[in-house]
């Protein structure tokens, strides 16, 4: 591979305040002497990771590029902003993003009758994984995905098992 593409949360970025100056995709790109494009952003969630990855690959040459995706927490909920929040951080894009955390909004969520917080998060996470995996497979883009933050897929729900085992 000549190029490495990386996307995720802060665990795929340097974090100098924490004394962390390297990250997985940086180490791999240096080891392989490959160009690195990194769209990872601290505190962001999986919707942004999936969508911005597909936008980048549609705007750039897919050939000779290996994708590394470090999934964020399924309890980080991204939304597109209309205020230009941190505009310009990702070249060639107009969208800007913010994130709210499920566990910071439990009072609101509990007011919604029957909202199953954990199963909702698991469903969204599985959907993000399979959506991006399908995109990579369809476009013949080699990739690896892993949980940069913990996510619970050990749920015995028939619907989830159907998707996980497909």
How should these model regions be labeled?
Residues 1-52, 58-60:
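Serine-esterase "nucleophile elbow" of acetyl-processing enzymes
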Residues 54-166:
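Alpha-helical cap/lid subdomain in secreted, periplasmic
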């Amino acid at each position: 591979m000549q190029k490495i593409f990386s996307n995720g949360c802060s665990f795929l970025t340097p974090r100098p305040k924490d004394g962390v100056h390297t990250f997985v995709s940086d180490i791999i790109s240096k080891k392989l002497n490959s160009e690195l494009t990194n769209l990872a952003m601290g505190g962001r969630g999986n919707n942004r990771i999936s969508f911005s990855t597909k936008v980048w690959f549609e705007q750039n040459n897919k050939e000779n590029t290996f994708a590394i995706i470090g999934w964020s927490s399924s309890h980080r909920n991204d939304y597109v902003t209309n205020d230009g929040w941190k505009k310009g951080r990702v070249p060639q894009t107009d969208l800007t993003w913010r994130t709210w955390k499920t566990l910071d909004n439990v009072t609101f969520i509990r007011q919604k009758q029957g909202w199953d917080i954990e199963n909702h998060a698991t469903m969204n996470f599985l959907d993000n994984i399979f959506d991006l995996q399908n995109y990579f497979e369809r476009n013949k883009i080699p990739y690896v995905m892993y949980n940069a933050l913990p996510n619970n897929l050990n749920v015995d729900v028939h619907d989830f098992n159907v998707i996980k085992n497909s």
